[in-house]
Amino acid sequence: IRGIDFLNYRSNATWDDNAAERTIQWVNEYKGIAALVWHWSVPSEEGSTDCNFYVESASANYTTFSISRALEEGTWENKVLMADIAEIAKQLKKLKDADVPVLWRPLHEAEGAWFWWGAEGPEPCKKLYRLLYDQLTNVYGLDNLIWVWNSYTYSTSPDWYPGDDVVDIVGYDKYNAVDGKPNLSSISSTFYSLVQSTDGQKMVAMAENDTIPSLENLLKDKASWLYFCPWYMNYLTSEQNNPAENLKEIYNSEYCITLDELPDLKKYPLDGSDADSDAVLAGDVNLDNAVNLADIILLQKYLLGEVTLTKEAYNCADVNTDEAVNGLDLSRLRQMSLENA
């Protein structure tokens, strides 16, 4: 998992940090999973290019942009909103065109109310989230987005949930290191509360965090977080957040799937079958879960043009995996049959 921020994308942006292109390059080169967040900056006044995402109580650099007014057609805020959605859709379409699926976590940490999209309560925030989902999915046709909703476990948190139909994964941002010391807790009570919040229908991830929980605590508490994604720089590389020994232990354990262990997700079967099943059944041309004389006869008939093969049978007939079915495969199949006799 690599986290990437699309914070420089908006309709009046003056600088492009090529986050979309960097996402495409990393996913295609390293075969990893990109987790995108969008610190959506907006102006306080019409026509202004001074844009921020924090509210006044959270930062000296803030915006007074109103989410409620932005949801009203005809306002200047609504024009900014829709133009920004069009811009982010353009960037996300680059990913779709490159066949790059991503974890997409917009309007994150809304309930904290330190960002403008959460400053006016749950109803306008949910309305904006659903508008964004409808625009990106139905208007712009982006089917490469796995939608992550950033939740909490407060008594008010259910009021903020936008709905099962627009959420794929429930995420939680964990920042609980105190006094310059890491907190290795699995926060299992939080995990199980989030699981229960959707009646177990959604996977739950640590979408953003400081300390990665220790392997011991994760196993002991059975807190099966889908993934974790430490924030950048010292959040990952300092002893006060993530001790080196803890990082080595979790990344080298069977519990954690690291980049080198991740299967090729573009080829991974969606039906839950083993991605390597074709290799295991190489030579099983008639698809009866055995390699024998019957497969040799069927392959001979195919090479003579007497029969055709289904795609699955063709893949099994490509014994030497050179993406072609010919006499070399027949020779290898005969050898395999003798070896199995």
Segment roles from a protein language model:
Residues 105-107, 111, 129-156, 201-212:
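Aromatic-lined carbohydrate-recognition surfaces of secreted/lumenal glycan-active proteins
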Residues 5-13, 68-82, 119-122, 171-182, ...:
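The substrate-binding groove and active-site-proximal loops of carbohydrate-active enzymes
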Residues 276-341:
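Cellulosome-associated attachment modules in secreted, modular CAZymes
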Residues 2, 157-181, 230-231:
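Aromatic- and acid-rich polysaccharide-binding/catalytic face
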Residues 18-21, 87-91, 150-162, 185-194, ...:
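Alpha-helical scaffolding within the catalytic cores
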Residues 12-15, 19-131, 138, 142:
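Substrate-binding cleft of extracellular glycoside hydrolase catalytic domains
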Residues 29-34, 97-103, 140-146, 165-168, ...:
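Loop/turn elements at helix/coil->beta-strand transitions in domains of secreted/extracellular proteins
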